[in-house]
Amino acid sequence: MLQLAEYVAETLDIGPGTRVFEVDCGRGEFLFPLHQNGYIVGGIDGDADAIKDAIAAMPGGLFQVGMASALDPAVPWDVIVCRSLAAAPSNDYIRGLVARMYAKATHAIALIDVPDAQHQPLVHAITEAGAQAIQIEGAHIFARV
């Protein structure tokens, strides 16, 4: 996960002190290397045990139990990451989630490991949310706010 975290940080030109929030963060495997390097991390996941593990592994991280569909855009973070779009139930769900992610982000969003079939709906959803700078690198989609 270290290489992926470094790749995302480099692609988005972010460094220590940046606030990175992950949707469906699980135990925080993606966020852990960022936390170790001085990033402020947080996330949301529906699995309470996974969130307990994330809190134990990353003291000071801001984690909460909840579904991605309940993501609150009122609390801003610099970067919002999602690695779970392969499990998205529909394009409407994707559109709503991307809109909330984009509204929550102050710098960028990163959609990681996106299946090919979801590229077009995601790019459309990101454009609807207001992004004008979208970068696609293989299975990853980045959008600046």
Where do the language-model regions lie?
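Conserved SAM-binding loop of SAM-dependent methyltransferases across substrates and taxa
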Residues: 27-37
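Conserved SAM/SAH-binding beta-strand->alpha-helix loop
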Residues: 47
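Conserved SAM-binding strand-loop segment of SAM-dependent methyltransferases
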Residues: 59-69
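A short, conserved alpha-helix within the catalytic core of class I
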Residues: 88-100
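Conserved beta-strand signature within the Rossmann-like core of class I S-adenosyl-L-methionine
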Residues: 106-114
